[in-house]
Amino acid sequence: MDPFHERLARTGLGAADRYGFALAGGYAVQAAGLVERPSEDVDLFTAWDRRDEFTAAVAAVVNAYRDDGLTVETERQYDTFARLAVTDGVRVSKVELGVDWRANEPILMAIGPVLHPDDAVANKMSALYGRAFARDFIDIDATLRSGRYTRDALLTLAKRADRGFDPRIFADALGQATQLDPDDFAQYGVTGPALDKLRGRFAQWRRELLDDEER
């Protein structure tokens, strides 16, 4: 993990642990040993049934960063989502706090509570379904290549996390792999033949899903 991001995660989790927060997003997938790539921000999420404590949790995290000598600007804040811009005077990073569905208790690791791998992967599937960024393709591809999850297992996790999950819409999202600019992948070190293979694997999955829908 990037050292500055590690500082932000440790400090944020130290303040928000009592509100049920855990490390989420790409770093949670990395903590599970499924992928290794640069990450742009730190995601800290709590469970849906603790959403009433969200505002207090955000305040606690902001105060913890300031007590740690960091400067914090709240860029956005709603009932269940907040985006902070945090700087040490040299670097600036986003910290996103939110509320999400989870099926399992977080796992306590050296950095603090981290989403259970099943929940981290389910959230990544939701991200791929909803926005289909390059990093979402990279994370899900790495998850599949790890051998710990099959395509069917990922679909099951996605459906459990989102009752509205539609395989046909997901198939459309997979088509974005060939539409995204190669530079979107290059910033994470995926280029040339590696990118071609990634796109090929998602194209195959897309065809399988569409074939299943037609049967």
Where in the sequence are the language-model features?
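Compositionally biased terminal segments of proteins
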Residues: M1-R215
